[in-house]
Amino acid sequence: MSSRFSSAPYDAYAALSTADIKHPTITLSTGPAVALTYGQYRAILATNRNQSDRAAAFAAYHELFAANVNTYASLYNGVLQRDWFHAQSRGYRSTLEAALHGNNIPTTVVENLIESTKAGTEPLRRYHRLRKRVLGLDTYHNYDGAIPIVDLDRKYSL
């Protein structure tokens, strides 16, 4: 019975972020107006070489979530409260300990992973600087990460 209620935050999130979403329309620099579905959003980020088009798609798509930020925050709080309740009722010291127990992973593994990740971000930053330079961008943003560095349209035949 508990699991049925435990899925309520996820079910509400899924309905809000898919079925109830009103996709915005943006106008690209080439002229056409595009209904910004998730598929169109990903396609623009991955194929459109115009940074201002990618920026417009990014802003419009994320505004969908910003419009309901309090609802999303409340749903996430429900997930956190549910997980905390389950961890406490089963005798765990934390939700992390509860999540890792089934695979017999000590919490120190995740804590070390987090610290190692924080300490090892320089290669990723160097990669982003390289992408910025190769793409000829003045600034580099999250929405620039999916665009290919080179144009390659190779056809293969069998």
PLM features: what roles do these ranges have?
Residues 1-108, 116:
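His/Asp/Glu-rich acidic catalytic environments and adjacent acidic regulatory segments
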Residues 106, 125-158:
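A conserved glycine-rich
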Residues 19, 71, 78, 123, ...:
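Generic macromolecular interface patches on structured domains
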Residues 111-127, 143-144:
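Long, non-coiled-coil amphipathic alpha-helical linker/lever segments
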